[in-house]
Amino acid sequence: MDVLSAVKQENIAASTEIDDLIFMGTPQQWSLQEQKQLTSRLVKGAYQYHYHNNDDYRQFCERLGVGEVVEDLNDIPVFPTSIFKLKTLLTLDDDEVENRFTSSGTSGIKSIVARDRLSIERLLGSVNFGMNYVGDWFDHQMELVNLGPDRFNANNIWFKYVMSLVELLYPTAFTVTEDEIDFEATLANMNRIKQSGKTICLIGPPYFIYLLCCFMREQGQTFNGGRDLYIITGGGWKKHQDQSLDRDEFNQLLCETFTLESPEQIRDTFNQEELNTCFFEDTEHKNGVPPWVFARALDPKTLKPLPHGQSGLMSYMDASAVSYPCFLVTDDIGIVREEEGDRPGTTVEIVRRVKTRGMKGCALSMSQAFTAKNDGGN
């Protein structure tokens, strides 16, 4: 993959350790222990940066009795993602904000996260880094068909923007306008790429991929993807959850509809609007966590870290975010594992969203503590 071309297009300067890692690293470059050392160093550095430069976050830490130096990553104060529905957290001056991104708002009030240029560039780097889990192509060897808008028409909706960034890495055709899929254009582009001898990558939310499959079946159309078609999904089923398929059913539908050689050609991605990094699945459909992100599962009642392999409330510390402190507790229940062997590193499995009042109440109390401090309650 010619990521340097994309880097030049966006005037990205990889000048620090984390930028070298994001823009020039590969997932299998380090042992598990080396990755853990990288994570510790980078996340602690990010914590000190935000502690010194973000008054809101520093006062929150002081309220919890945590100073600027931490020995253990688990000591770094985290806050619930619901904070972003209540206020804008900024470590930089307002005039350094490149864009303010919103969530899709499927569950009510939208989150708003302000990002500077470097944070956005690092997000692009995480997409490039994650594509290495899928395969290794130069930009002249693959073309993409995106069931979504380009980044100029994503209307600042985070998921749409993230999915559109691939156009900076590979030639990309966009076949959705205002959430309307042009099925014929999608298939025409896929056939054009196939005839050129290049690898095809179809990307989009799972519901849109599902609708394309339904259209093809209704029209009696087929596509022989063989080993030359990859399908990357992201964003979940959202408001179409009532039509969702479980993963095995979804994979089977895609393998049959597109005549794929293996389910390994189907990959999901994970990202949420408050997180500045995109996680890609490997060949075993495990979401790999890059070394600049610390992921853990917390006990929903005590918010204490759980042993690897146990399900709990997902928490992330993302060192790539410059414009805001990305030290989060989410509304997801998931499992964090450490992997050795051929693919060393940390993986996450998202099981479900939080449903019980007790779990949400814990996040609410943290939000109230954060906002109370901002109102002068020190």
Swiss-Prot record:
GO MF annotation terms: ATP binding; long-chain fatty acid--protein ligase activity
Gene3D superfamilies: N-terminal domain of ligase-like
Pathway noted in the entry: Lipid metabolism; fatty acid reduction for biolumincescence
Catalysed reactions, semicolon-separated: a long-chain fatty acid + L-cysteinyl-[protein] + ATP = an S-(long-chain fatty acyl)-L-cysteinyl-[protein] + AMP + diphosphate
GO biological process: bioluminescence
EC top class, as a word: ligase
Entry EC number(s): 6.2.1.19
Keyword ATP-binding tagged: yes
InterPro entries: ANL_N_sf, LuxE, LuxE_bac
Keywords: ATP-binding, Ligase, Luminescence, Nucleotide-binding
One of the Pfam families matching this protein, by short name: LuxE
UniProt function note: Acyl-protein synthetase activates tetradecanoic acid. It is a component of the fatty acid reductase complex responsible for converting tetradecanoic acid to the aldehyde which serves as substrate in the luciferase-catalyzed reaction.
Family affiliation: Belongs to the LuxE family.
Protein name: Long-chain-fatty-acid--luciferin-component ligase
Encoding gene (name): luxE
